[in-house]
Amino acid sequence: MSATSSPQQSEGADFTQRVTYTFMIGVYLAVNAIRDLYLLIEGPDCTYMKTQYVQGNHDWLSTLTSVSGLHRIANTALHPAQMSGSREESLQATLQRIASHPAVPAVALTSMPMAFITGAEYARLTRQVARVSGKPIIHVQGKSLSGDWIDGYAEVLLSLARQLDLSGGSPCETKA
């Protein structure tokens, strides 16, 4: 490596600090924009508090959290002590409980890196809950380490496009 090149240039990967919102904030922004979509994050409690980035700074009318207690963002309260055991059964039960609520039309499931690396089969879990609930349950890959907010927003849209069955649908009439 020459004196003028940086490690980021020579290695091909850029691990410098970002001055932007995170991947997960982009996921929240997408969920905020789709009023029929609820989100379960396999991750610690701090994931819930990140809703303030949207509600406090971006959209004061956001419905991601509600004084009624029916929040559109939920988490599994994953703690590092739980990481070594299988969590799929409890994760599926939580996802099923959210999907079974009559006010919930659709649910997305994503994960923080600490959960993703343990190998839970999120796509299988979402398919099983969708089959039982009869509602769309979408798996959004947890790519928090590889992108920023716009990547998170795009990943939600890509996941919806790939996983929603739109056959038999019809365009909405435009309101004048």
Residue ranges and their predicted role:
Residues 1-176:
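An N-terminal assembly and electron-transfer interface module characteristic of large anaerobic redox
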